[in-house]
């Protein structure tokens, strides 16, 4: 190709790349400005640009400077005869070094580049640790190794043909790749400059934990950058000197010239100093060792690996000084080179063999005695990292005291026993409330609302499900550009169901159902809740959902084309968006920029758009919050909250009535001695609550744990992003709940780390497990569930998340953990342990007893034979005073139509199990003692029919 054409091609490519970059920066700035947080993006952009520039210049200078020196001295001749070396062996060694470097670099870059930064911060591998190098070469897989082999051999062939164009190209690409990679790692580098003391220190090096949480991740990234720069420089310079002076044609190497040797010695000094620093860093990384019975530094790490690293750190420093001193005197003696080679081989052998020998011959025969002090640290730091040290432990001794009088005294608990699970309710919704194929209910969540009832103000547990628009369900013939971006723009409304009520046919009851003008808000007489009470707490005034879980396409609104609002009979009702979401399209020039940003060539030619049209993009709530704060990890279960429009306006929320609440976490994998278990992190705090307006798309971040050092640091870096929790509108704050993902992580760690005695911990004879249950005919692990109950020492009912535990390998229940959600008690964990000398039935044992009951099993078998299927719901353990009540709903589904109907309720208490059509009948049958006279407070709860069932002797 002519040189002028290639230059034109490069110029055009550079202009296109620059235009694309500037367009992206401009549109992102508009997007963040529309959200009221432009400084969040501009600060991030400035940091990334600074990292890219500094690292790019540094790596380019390092590699380029060495190559320039090598080019100047590549033809220098040795000043004295040197033994001739066969080039074949040298070429083989150089090729293997080059392939290993490229393979390991490719693997590390891909691991960091492909990480999902929102779910957990990207974790680079421990570059240059011998364990990582060994495992990477063995287990890297065909892709990185194959890529390294291909690049290594290919570059070597090209190098023999056109060495300098190849070296310049590879060095430029390497510098660019490292600069880009480092700029992406701003999440781990920037906090190191804003971190403050955590006050706690690690037990080995006595360093503040802020070093491990903030500075160690940054040092690991910079170590990686320096390693690539030095390794590339050394290999490239070595290749230049080896293959110069007709070495290839003569098939022999005549030795290095003094200038070349001085150059290589300077590189060797730099590498020795780097390795000394790496050994210092690797000592701290031992705090995350997984060797032996302890997570963190154990006996072998403390007395073998740590001393080895300390000795090597000193030796590398001495080697650097010796090399510098000897290089000033002249050429390195051959014995020095041989000694360095022998020392390197010996070091690798010692690192691989000595820890294994000590672990197997010294530690394992006396493991408990050797590891005891380290087990204490692992228990202590793991409990701190997961917040288990804040759990309040109490004894729960179930008594045979449950009767109708106790149930009456705990009316709000009984009234909120969940009979509808989210899965069968979603099945019902999809058949009864989906309305059209393009609507979908992606999830249903448990929440509570405080409603005015005929017996007073009370909490009511509900299941809420958003009716979102799923564009993927649109028929293929209707999938046009206009429909995708102008017509099908939003979902509509939601369903709200009490968890404890069903219609006479067994289908769920609804507080809110249907769509558009037919939307109905309905009370529930059986619960003593009027329609007016529901309307006072819940609004359907602005039910449109422009931002949700399924809203992945960008839309333009308002436009000259009306948007589909909702179907009405055989027709559709249309609407025009009047919200504040999105970015104004503006003039035609900006329209062209949006076209480039969205990669949508139709956009500039659409006649339906105006200057006032807004571009609503990044509408999927998880994508939206991750774009704003990628340093947080987000819960898998966002939930919708409906707010009375008048209350919302009075609280400064505008006339919006639907808001998403999403829990966000600060996480790290650099908390010393903290065992991550099955998680990709070993430290977690629920530091932030995120509120997203479903109509306008506004996003607010509220700090709920100001003591967390991670969120303290991020709030200093982004002061305009976060608000204190006291700034949240009370109407939304009343819907906060203990987050599911955090509770699962904590309860998972508690299975092992409830044990404080290291001897018992090591023996593993007091491990817990999650109980099992039969759900819809399949065995499944009991998942944490929300409920409303009154804790034994509490004054009133509250909204909790609860999970039971059983001993490992046994089915009886041994404890239960509760996370509190209401008021000042929010965020507290309570662990109730059962007496060890008594047998408390676990869910699996209750399930077995249900299956063994002849009447229940006969009825279920009969249903299954009649073309239907009886599906078990979640078996709930309900603590009431000092007793445990077990409740399991039973649904009936037709074999051809999976529309579940609540057909029976099974309740169990002590050695009694009953199954009846309703919860009230079950309780009446389960507790057949005489019923005390109902007080006026309790009378409105029951309908006439229900009262007759529960109180047959009352007139």
Curated annotation (Swiss-Prot):
Q: Which UniProt keywords apply?
A: Cell membrane, Membrane, Transmembrane, Transmembrane helix
Report the subcellular localization: Cell membrane
Gene Ontology annotations for the cellular component aspect, listed alphabetically: extracellular region; plasma membrane
Stored InterPro entries:
UPF0182
Membrane topology (UniProt): Multi-pass membrane protein
Q: Domain of life, per the record?
A: Bacteria
TM ranges are: 12-32, 45-65, 85-105, 141-161, 163-183, 224-244, 263-283, 306-326, 343-363
Its predominant location is membrane
Tell me its family.
Belongs to the UPF0182 family.
The family database entries (HAMAP family) matched by this protein are listed as: UPF0182
Supply the name of the protein. Answer: UPF0182 protein Synpcc7942_1783
């Amino acid at each position: 190709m002519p040189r002028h054409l290639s230059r034109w091609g490069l110029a055009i490519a550079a202009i296109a790349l620059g235009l694309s970059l500037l367009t992206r920066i401009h549109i992102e700035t508009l997007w963040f400005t529309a959200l009221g947080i432009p400084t969040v993006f501009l600060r991030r952009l400035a940091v990334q640009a600074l990292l890219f520039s500094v690292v790019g210049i540094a790596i380019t200078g390092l590699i380029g400077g060495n190559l320039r020196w090598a080019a100047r001295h590549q033809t220098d001749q040795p000043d004295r005869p040197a033994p001739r070396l066969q080039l074949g062996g040298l070429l083989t060694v150089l090729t293997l070094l080059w392939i290993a470097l490229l393979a390991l670099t490719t693997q590390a870059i891909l691991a960091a580049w492909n990480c999902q930064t929102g779910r957990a911060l990207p974790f680079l591998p421990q570059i240059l640790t011998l364990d990582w190098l060994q495992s990477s070469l063995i287990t890297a897989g065909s892709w990185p190794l194959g890529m390294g082999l291909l690049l290594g051999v290919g570059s070597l062939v090209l190098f023999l043909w056109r060495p300098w164009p190849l070296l310049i190209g590879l060095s430029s690409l390497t510098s660019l790749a490292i600069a880009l990679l480092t700029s992406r790692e701003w999440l781990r580098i920037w906090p190191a400059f804003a971190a403050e003391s955590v006050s706690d220190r690690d037990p080995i090096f006595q360093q503040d934990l802020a070093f491990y949480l903030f500075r160690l991740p940054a040092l690991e990234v910079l170590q990686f950058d320096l390693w690539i720069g030095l390794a590339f420089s050394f290999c490239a310079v070595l290749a230049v000197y080896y293959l110069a002076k007709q070495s290839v044609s003569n098939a022999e190497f005549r030795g290095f010239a003094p200038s070349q040797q001085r150059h290589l010695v300077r590189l060797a000094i730099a590498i020795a100093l780097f390795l000394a620093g790496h050994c210092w860093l690797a000592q701290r990384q031992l705090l995350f060792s997984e060797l032996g019975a302890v997570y963190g530094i154990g006996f072998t790490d403390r007395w073998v690996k740590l001393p080895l690293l300390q000795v090597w750190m000193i030796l590398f420093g001495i080697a650097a000084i010796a090399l510098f001193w000897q290089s000033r005197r002249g050429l390195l003696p051959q014995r020095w080179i041989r000694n360095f080679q022998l020392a390197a081989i010996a070091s690798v052998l010692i690192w691989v063999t000595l820890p294994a020998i000590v672990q197997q011959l010294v530690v394992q025969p006396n493991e408990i005695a050797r590891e005891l002090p380290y087990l204490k640290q692992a228990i202590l730091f793991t409990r701190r990292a997961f917040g288990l040290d804040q759990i309040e432990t109490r004894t729960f001794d179930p008594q045979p005291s449950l009767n109708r009088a106790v149930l009456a005294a705990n009316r709000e608990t009984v009234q909120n026993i969940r009979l509808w699970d989210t899965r069968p309710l979603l099945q019902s919704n999809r058949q009864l409330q989906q309305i059209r194929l393009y609507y979908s209910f992606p999830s249903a969540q448990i929440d509570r609302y405080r409603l005015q009832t005929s017996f007073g103000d009370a909490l009511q547990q509900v299941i809420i499900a958003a009716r979102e628009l799923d564009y993927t369900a649109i028929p293929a013939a209707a999938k046009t550009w206009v429909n995708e971006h102008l017509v099908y723009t939003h979902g509509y409304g939601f369903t709200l169901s009490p968890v404890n009520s069903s219609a006479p046919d067994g289908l769920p009851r609804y507080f809110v159902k249907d769509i558009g003008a037919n939307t109905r808000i309905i009370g529930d007489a059986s619960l003593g809740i009027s329609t007016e009470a529901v309307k006072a707490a819940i609004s359907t005034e602005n039910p449109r959902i422009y931002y949700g879980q399924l809203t992945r396409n960008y839309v333009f609104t308002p436009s000259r084309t009306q948007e589909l609002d909702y179907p009405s009979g055989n027709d559709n009702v249309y609407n025009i968006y009047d919200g504040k979401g999105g970015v104004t399209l503006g003039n035609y020039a900006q329209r062209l920029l949006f076209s480039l940003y969205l990669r949508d060539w139709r956009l500039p030619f659409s006649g339906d758009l105006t200057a006032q049209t807004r571009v609503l993009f990044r509408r999927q709530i998880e994508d939206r919050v991750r774009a704003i704060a990628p340093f947080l990890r987000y819960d898998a279960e966002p939930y919708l909250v409906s707010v009375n429009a008048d209350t919302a306006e009075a609280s400064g929320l505008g006339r919006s009535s639907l808001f998403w609440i999403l829990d966000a976490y600060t996480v790290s994998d650099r908390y010393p001695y903290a065992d991550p278990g099955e998680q990709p992190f070993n430290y977690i705090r629920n530091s932030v609550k995120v509120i997203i307006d479903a109509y306008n798309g506004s996003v607010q971040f509220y700090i709920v744990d100001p003591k967390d050092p991670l969120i303290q640091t991020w709030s200093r870096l982004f002061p305009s992003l976060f608000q204190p929790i006291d700034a949240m509108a009370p109407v939304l704050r009343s819907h906060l709940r203990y987050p599911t993902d955090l509770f699962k992580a904590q309860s998972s760690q508690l299975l092992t780390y409830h044990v404080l005695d290291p001897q018992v911990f090591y023996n593993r004879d007091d491990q817990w497990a999650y109980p099992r249950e039969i759900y819809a005919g399949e065995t499944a692990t009991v998942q944490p569930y929300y409920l409303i109950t009154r804790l034994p020492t509490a004054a009133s009912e509250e909204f909790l998340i609860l999970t039971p535990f059983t001993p490992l390998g046994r089915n009886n229940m041994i404890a239960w953990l509760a996370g509190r959600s209401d008021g000042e008690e929010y965020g507290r964990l309570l662990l109730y342990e059962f007496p060890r000398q008594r047998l408390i039935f676990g869910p699996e044992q209750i399930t077995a007893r249900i299956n063994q009951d002849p009447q229940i099993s006969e009825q279920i078998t009969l249903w299954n034979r009649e073309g239907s299927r009886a599906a078990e719901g979640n078996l709930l353990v309900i603590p009431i005073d000092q007793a445990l009540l077990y409740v399991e709903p039973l649904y009936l589904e037709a074999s051809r139509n999976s529309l579940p109907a609540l057909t029976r309720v099974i309740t169990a208490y002590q050695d009694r199990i009953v199954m009846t059509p309703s919860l009230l009948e079950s309780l009446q049958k389960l507790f057949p003692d005489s019923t005390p006279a109902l007080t006026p407070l309790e009378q409105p709860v029951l309908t006439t029919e229900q009262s007759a069932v529960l109180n047959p002797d009352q007139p």
